[in-house]
Regions:
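Transmembrane helix boundary and interhelical junction motifs in multipass membrane proteins
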Residues: 23-32, 157-167
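Hydrophobic, membrane-facing alpha-helical anchors
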Residues: 1-6, 10, 53-64, 159-168, ...
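Juxtamembrane transmembrane-helix boundary motif
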Residues: 1-19, 33-39, 44, 65-151, ...
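A small-residue-rich subset of transmembrane alpha-helices
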Residues: 54, 182-199, 208-221
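Short, structured loop/turn "capping" segments at alpha-beta junctions
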Residues: 126-127, 143, 158-163, 174-178
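Transmembrane helix-bundle signature of multi-pass membrane transporters/permeases
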Residues: 18, 48-56, 180-191, 244
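Membrane-interface alpha-helices at helix entry/exit sites of multi-pass transporters
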Residues: 42-50, 75-76, 173-184
Length: 258
């Protein structure tokens, strides 16, 4: 495999993953994994490990950008994160007991549908509306929704970022920027946990592919997060929707190729 091919594939994979992360808190695994498997012949387990490790820094830099612009709910984010991590383990164990069925297509299709939703029905909640919710109620919501997301993610092994964004905006009534900021904050830690366990079990991947994916994803996530925090709500909804629809269609295409 030529170095040029590796650079091109990782650049576009990182671009898709970074834009998805910075705009919508989407997991890099949804974009990077299928591209590495389809075009570079990377073994699936390794591809997911590379994608998760690319997610860590991209989510961290996005979370920092959202936090700097006061678009991050750390307190409830921590409650939800603990709940998500615990129930992901329970969900993974439950999945190991039933006949294996790959559900990767589910999260990609969900990405596409969520994109359509943001374009047609933008999230126009304001911070003032969010502030009216009782703190205790918000904490309970974070706990329950985190458990639900973790259980689904652990069971089907995908879809965390999109599940979180959908839950935060539709169920918990978060304003879009705060929802994405909180989602990428949680994902920094869930991706780190996933990446470490992947590499502990499967060993380290090809250094060049790995490094390029991490750098390109980080770069594009930073660009997307800066733009997202400056944009007006309606513009942001449309931009997020377009990014998700395009990524959803592209990844469905890669899955057909594979």
């Amino acid at each position: 495999m030529s170095i040029l091919t590796t650079v091109l594939v990782t650049f576009f994979a990182g671009m898709g993953a970074g834009l998805g992360t910075g705009f919508a808190g989407m997991s890099a695994a949804a974009v990077i994994s299928p591209m590495l498997i389809t075009f570079l012949g990377v073994e699936p387990y390794m591809a997911v490990g590379i994608a998760l490790s690319s997610d860590v820094l991209a989510s961290a830099v996005s979370a920092y950008t959202y936090h700097k612009n006061k678009n991050l709910d750390i307190k409830n984010g921590l409650i939800m994160m603990a709940s998500v991590l615990l129930f992901t383990v329970i969900g993974s164990y439950a999945a190991s007991l039933v006949p294996s069925a790959t559900m990767g297509g589910f999260s990609v299709f969900m990405t596409f549908l969520l994109g359509v939703k943001f374009i047609l029905r933008p999230v126009m909640t304001t911070k003032e509306t969010m502030a009216q919710v009782d703190a205790k109620k918000r904490a309970v919501q974070s706990l329950v929704c985190g458990a639900m997301i973790g259980m689904i993610c652990g069971f089907i092994g995908a879809g965390g970022g999109m599940m979180m964004l959908l839950t935060l905006t539709s169920v918990m009534g978060y304003e879009l920027k705060t929802a994405v900021g909180t989602s990428v904050f949680i994902m920094t830690f869930t991706a780190l946990t996933g990446a470490v366990s992947h590499f502990a079990i499967g060993g380290l991947p090809d250094t060049l592919t790995w490094a390029l994916c991490v750098v390109f994803t980080l770069l594009w996530a930073r660009i997307a997060a800066v733009f997202a925090n400056r944009a007006q709500p309606k513009t942001l909804n449309r931009a997020t929707g377009v990014v998700l629809v395009v990524l959803g269609i592209a990844v469905m295409g890669f899955q057909l190729l594979a």
